[in-house]
């Protein structure tokens, strides 16, 4: 386990985590997931604990929905990290098509798809809709489908990562690692609204860029120990080793430094918003938007040190 990423934000844990944990455990157990999938999202994985850091003020139902989404991510991630060990499960094309079908049809009683994971996705979408409303669920679903489109290209794209720069890698990593989905969840759960007035705002886009960069880099940093043993080539540490010629320890240190720099970048954006005189009413909206992502960064820096997933 590498050294923890330092982050001065004073994080809080959601007081509803025990209630959400109980409901989460019941739902996961009832889905009849494959044993390997169930193992990585139950018990010591502390999935609800992660969501409790990202969404410290969410009610129990919202925290549960967010936890189920995190479970979806982890199962999806492990399926492709260890695809060569897959015991006859769905091929990538079938998997991606199934997720897309669920996102498109979850509001109707569609046919039960062949992998229990799809019922986890269906349950997650239903819970997000109940907790956040139709507009939020539709936007989240749209971003999930965009992430699936990116994942379809990831397998081919990975063959070129020995030549690409870290900047180019990160520009696409945000798509297939679902950080764009996370940004949407943050604004609806922590921000409590769509922030529609900021949709085309360049400062909002700068905030998003920093948040997703930190999310991608911190995940790569903490997960390198397990990913280097698997077939996954999507990792900033590997990119730096291949492209820049760094040894493993130097590459890890660079990724960690880039995580710290991203936090500094976000602080600078926040300070510049406060000092700008031309933003008008958008200034407070931008500050609120930025603030809704702070817990995510805290969780991304902290949770990996608390779970057995990265050990």
From Swiss-Prot:
Top-level taxon of the source organism: Bacteria
Enzyme Commission code(s) on record: 4.2.3.36
UniProt keyword terms in alphabetical order: Antibiotic biosynthesis, Lyase, Magnesium, Metal-binding
Pathway where this protein functions: Antibiotic biosynthesis
Entry annotated with the keyword Nuclease: no
BP GO annotations: antibiotic biosynthetic process
Mutant phenotype after disruption: Mutants do not produce terpentecin.
Keyword Lyase in record: yes
Catalytic activity from the UniProt record: terpentedienyl diphosphate = terpentetriene + diphosphate
Pfam families named among the record's database cross-references: Terpene_syn_C_2
Motif residue range(s): DDXXD motif: 77-81
Temperature-activity profile: Optimum temperature is 50 degrees Celsius.
Gene Ontology terms, MF aspect: metal ion binding; terpentetriene synthase activity
Cofactor(s) named in the record: Mg(2+)
pH dependence: Optimum pH is 6.8.
SUPFAM superfamilies: Terpenoid synthases (SSF48576)
Family to which this protein belongs: Belongs to the terpene synthase family.
Function: Involved in the production of the isoprenoid antibiotic terpentecin. Converts terpentedienol diphosphate (TDP) into terpentetriene (TTE). Can also accept geranylgeranyl diphosphate (GGDP) and farnesyl diphosphate (FDP) as substrates.
Subunit text: Homodimer.
Protein name: Terpentetriene synthase
Source species of the chain: Kitasatospora griseola (Streptomyces griseolosporeus)
């Amino acid at each position: 386990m590498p050294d923890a990423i330092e982050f001065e934000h004073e994080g809080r844990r959601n007081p509803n985590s025990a209630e959400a944990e109980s409901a989460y455990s019941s739902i996961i157990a009832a889905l009849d997931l494959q044993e390997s999938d169930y193992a990585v999202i139950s018990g010591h994985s502390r999935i609800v604990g992660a969501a409790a850091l990202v969404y410290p003020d969410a009610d129990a139902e919202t925290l549960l929905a967010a936890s189920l989404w995190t479970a979806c991510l982890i199962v999806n991630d492990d399926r492709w990290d260890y695809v060569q060990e897959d015991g006859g499960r769905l091929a990538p094309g079938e998997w991606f098509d199934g997720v897309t079908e669920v996102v498109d049809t979850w509001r109707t009683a569609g046919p039960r798809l062949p992998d229990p994971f799809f019922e986890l996705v269906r349950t997650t979408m239903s819970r997000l809709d109940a907790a956040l409303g139709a507009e939020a669920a539709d936007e989240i679903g749209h971003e999930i489908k965009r992430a699936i489109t990116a994942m379809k290209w990831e397998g081919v794209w990975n063959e070129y990562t020995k030549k690409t720069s870290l900047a180019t890698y990160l520009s696409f990593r945000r798509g297939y690692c679902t950080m764009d989905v996370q940004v949407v969840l943050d604004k609806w759960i922590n921000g409590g609204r769509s922030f529609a007035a900021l949709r085309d705002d360049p400062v909002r886009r700068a905030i998003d860029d920093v948040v997703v960069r930190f999310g991608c880099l911190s995940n790569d940093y903490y997960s390198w120990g397990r990913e280097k043993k698997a077939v996954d080539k999507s990792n900033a540490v590997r990119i730096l080793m291949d492209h820049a010629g760094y040894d493993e320890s130097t590459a890890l240190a660079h990724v960690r430094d880039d995580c710290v720099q991203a936090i500094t970048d976000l602080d600078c954006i926040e300070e510049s918003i406060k000092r700008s005189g031309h933003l008008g009413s958008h200034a407070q909206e931008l500050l609120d938007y930025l603030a809704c992502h702070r817990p995510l960064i805290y969780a991304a820096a902290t949770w990996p040190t608390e779970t057995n997933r990265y050990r």
